[in-house]
Curated annotation (Swiss-Prot):
Key word Heme present: no
Active site: D80, E173
Organism annotation: Yersinia pseudotuberculosis serotype O:3 (strain YPIII)
Sites where the protein binds Zn(2+) 2: D140, E174, H379
Any single GO BP term: proteolysis
Cofactor(s) for this UniProt protein: Zn(2+)
Name of this protein: Peptidase T
Positions annotated to bind Zn(2+) 1: H78, D140, D196
Function: Cleaves the N-terminal amino acid of tripeptides.
Length: 411
């Protein structure tokens, strides 16, 4: 079996599901176990400067094999899988030469259907790797890890000219902490690419501005038979609050460059209620306006309440649109575009309706757009990837590395 797939299957065997609302990084021990395994693998493969931080970030260097000065570049992927779906006991299925139609996911009624996922129509003849319907696959982002390491090994064995290349594998990307303890100075690259995208050709340097919003509503509970003028129902206030938000500006009604408000959870009693939202927008001004709107709604709904009853709102910015930083370094995008074209791939430039480690790293001084892995339908049982997509990602990583050295020689 191809070594690329061997690596991928090994990595997905580790349960690295991240946990939200955990103070420690990494948030789960499985991530640390995978990090330790990668550290040993990189040492065995002969990489230099292999390190594993206290927070589970693995770094290593593939030393230059050319005599002229070349900018140090980097490639980054993340160890963890989504907290939204189990990543324990992943059992990948290989579907060779896909001929169309439904693909049974394990034993049972679960299928991967082109009716629900029309992209399958474009993948006839490809080798698909799917789940067994019980877990996610973990292509997000263990495919990225496998692709980066495989690309580095091939660069070395085929003696393709390249400068120093830094690689890193980070924890807790899925819960927004991947870059929190990433040491940019230690990584010491002029720019990098996260390998954390989707289908073949994806090249992304725009992402949401993102914030989390926690709302606490304190009411007053008395017997409903004698409640008139006294009871303040926190749940009623919560529903009033939510109804003040625009109905069509939610994830299920938005796409492309549209922003949204998303109610993730609501719980409570008459006495007390809690709501958790996320706010997303590509435009910084619109992003700030959305946050202000949420504060204004809290003031309106809470107006006139008894002094012991109130609405408290806490807004935390998570990350910003890396476009602000990337456009200062247009050659980084142009280089990736050219590498894809050289690999017979049409670059697909589109905004990330989410975030990556690269977003935070770009604001820490490491410009870091995102390139594809070849995977689809992340964060659930319908996740899959194509072997052809993985091989293309490896080829692009290698070509970016080669082009960087080639252009440095010519300049």
């Amino acid at each position: 079996m191809d070594k690329l797939l061997d690596r991928f299957f090994n990595y997905v065997s580790f349960d690295t599901q991240a946990k939200a609302n955990v103070k420690s990084v990494p948030s789960t021990q499985g991530q640390r176990k995978l990090a330790q395994a990668l550290q040993q693998e990189l040492l065995t493969l002969g990489f230099s400067h292999v390190t594993l931080s206290d927070h589970g970030c693995v770094m290593a260097t593939l030393p230059a094999n050319v005599s002229w000065p070349v900018p140090t570049i980097g490639f980054i992927a993340h160890l963890d899988t989504s907290p939204d779906f189990s990543g324990k006991n992943v059992n990948p299925q290989i579907v060779e030469n896909y001929r169309g139609g439904d693909i049974a996911l394990g034993i049972g009624d679960e299928v991967l259907s082109p009716v629900m996922f029309p992209v399958l129509h474009q993948l006839l003849g490809h080798t698909l790797i799917t789940t067994d319907g019980k877990t996610l696959l973990g292509a997000d982002d263990k495919a990225g890890i496998a692709e980066i390491i495989t690309a580095m090994v091939r660069l070395k064995h085929r003696n393709v000219p390249h400068g120093d290349i830094r690689i890193a594998f980070t924890p807790d990307e899925e819960v927004g902490k991947g870059a929190q303890f990433f040491n940019v100075a230690e990584f010491d690259a002029q720019w990098a690419y996260t390998v954390d995208g989707g289908g073949i050709g994806e090249l992304e340097f725009e992402n949401f501005n993102a914030a989390s919003v926690a709302i606490k509503i304190v009411g007053n509970n008395v017997h409903p038979g004698s409640a008139k003028g006294v009871m303040v129902n926190a749940l009623s206030l919560a529903t009033r609050y939510h109804q003040e938000l625009p109905v069509d500006e939610t994830p299920e009604y938005t796409e492309g460059y549209d922003g949204f408000y998303h109610l993730q959870s609501i719980k409570g009693t008459v006495e007390r209620a809690e709501m958790h939202y996320i706010v997303r927008d590509f435009n910084r001004d619109s992003f700030e306006a959305r946050k202000k709107n949420m504060v204004d709604i809290a003031k309106r709904v809470g107006k006139g309440l008894h002094r012991d009853c109130y609405i408290e709102i806490v807004i935390d910015d998570s990350y910003y649109n890396m476009r602000e930083q990337i456009i200062k370094h247009p050659h980084i995008i142009e280089l990736a575009q050219q590498a894809m074209l050289d690999c017979d791939i049409t670059p697909i430039m589109k905004p990330i309706r989410g975030g990556t480690d690269g977003a935070q790293l770009s604001f820490k001084g490491l410009p870091c757009p995102n390139i594809f892995t070849g995977g689809y339908n992340y964060h659930g049982k319908h996740e899959f990837i194509t072997l052809e997509g993985m091989e293309k990602a490896v080829a692009v990583i290698m070509r970016i590395s080669e082009l960087t050295a080639k252009r440095a020689k010519e300049s």
